[in-house]
Amino acid sequence: MTSTHLPATLLLLGSGELGKEVAIAAQRLGCRVVAVDRYANAPAMQVADTAVVIPMTDAEALKQVIREHQPALVIPEIEALAVDALAELEAEGITVIPTARATAITMNRDRIRDLAAGELGLRTARFGYASSAEELSSAAEPLGWPVVVKPVMSSSGKGQSVATNPEELQQAWTAATQGARGSASLVIVEEFLRFEQEITLLTVRQKDGPTLFCPPIGHIQERGDYQCSWQPAELQQSQLLEAQRMARQVTDALGGAGIFGVEFFIASGEVIFSELSPRPHDTGLVTLRGQNLSEFELHLRAVLGLPIPSITSTGAAASRVVLAGADQQGGPVHYRGVAEALAVPESELLLFGKPEARPMRRMGVALASGSSLAEARGRADTAAQAVALEIGG
């Protein structure tokens, strides 16, 4: 087995709540963590050995900080990055997780969709692309109504909307272009799937060893952003095997080591590929409660070349996010109801430590276990609903 010599220096590009859990898992293995993001006091910076603030889309700033710290591994945790700089650094011998190419492909919905549907032939929703409002109208018409319109470059549901008729396409075009990351004006338009489930299949590619899969995670999204998740999701065996086949195929095409969050729809009993993130997934926060090894521990073991003897479910588990209110903005942030949340049996609460609130921003998550998925989900919901934010003071 090819493993990274420990202790190693790991550099996180992105320091949000998922990066924070990666940093904690890394430090438990004796690693030194450098947390980089565009704003100070980001969640992972609060536990890292070193914190650096730079414009994340500035290629020169990104190259400078990586060359300065000479990490054993560069671990991207967000999508808004100067990916061309990562390719240049990789050519210099810096290891990017999973690879610079995979990072570049998956930050663009058109590139990952072209790979999955075009090159690999995976089943996806019917879709088209448009670079103007006029092209959007032409691309949407054959798909039927409603349609989903998204920027090809965005995250957390930014710029995503549903158009129920041709008259709403101009508004959808405006929302997509305004919500896009950078100056990209290309949008993807998809048929609206009436699905039974949305699932995440966390897929682990090892340096040496077979691809492994976590128990499937069910989740619900609103405004294109994760609201709750539960594990294990209830799938037919044939559906699980098909999801695993598709996940293995697309992650093999991307290459590299680490955990991949592969999202699927289950619609009319069929498994349909949706999206992919080459890193721990927000819906996978539930693995802190539902598995013997969390997605963050698995990611670290995979990228460091350490063994993963097994991935097993520890029972029914669920998560529910704690959101800022629709009118809450700024900081400092204070929390009420924490004691009430922690009084819920078999529950825990993670408050991410984000320095400022924004409307509907994810500020924490409640996790819970139970004798059934219904009990676990009910407990997570109760704990999350007990928490309220106060701004200022």
Curated annotation (Swiss-Prot):
Homodimer. It comes from Synechococcus sp. (strain RCC307). Its EC number is 6.3.1.21. Keywords: ATP-binding, Ligase, Magnesium, Metal-binding, Nucleotide-binding, Purine biosynthesis. ATP binds at residues 109, 150, 155-160, 190-193, 198. InterPro entries: ATP-grasp, ATP-grasp_carboxylate-amine, ATP_grasp_subdomain_1, PreATP-grasp_dom_sf, PurT, PurT/PurK_preATP-grasp, PurT_C, Rudment_hybrid_motif. One of its GO terms (biological process) is 'de novo' IMP biosynthetic process. The keyword Nucleotide-binding applies. GO terms for cellular component: cytosol. HAMAP family: PurT. Residues 114-304 form the ATP-grasp domain. Involved in the de novo purine biosynthesis. Catalyzes the transfer of formate to 5-phospho-ribosyl-glycinamide (GAR), producing 5-phospho-ribosyl-N-formylglycinamide (FGAR). Formate is provided by PurU via hydrolysis of 10-formyl-tetrahydrofolate. Belongs to the PurK/PurT family. Gene3D superfamilies: 3.40.50.20, ATP-grasp fold, A domain, ATP-grasp fold, B domain. It comes from the Bacteria. Pathway: Purine metabolism; IMP biosynthesis via de novo pathway; N(2)-formyl-N(1)-(5-phospho-D-ribosyl)glycinamide from N(1)-(5-phospho-D-ribosyl)glycinamide (formate route): step 1/1. GO terms for molecular function: ATP binding; magnesium ion binding; phosphoribosylglycinamide formyltransferase 2 activity; phosphoribosylglycinamide formyltransferase activity. N(1)-(5-phospho-beta-D-ribosyl)glycinamide binds at residues 17-18, 77, 282, 354, 361-362. It is an enzyme of class 6 (ligase). This is Formate-dependent phosphoribosylglycinamide formyltransferase. It catalyses: N(1)-(5-phospho-beta-D-ribosyl)glycinamide + formate + ATP = N(2)-formyl-N(1)-(5-phospho-beta-D-ribosyl)glycinamide + ADP + phosphate + H(+). Mg(2+) binds at residues 263, 275.
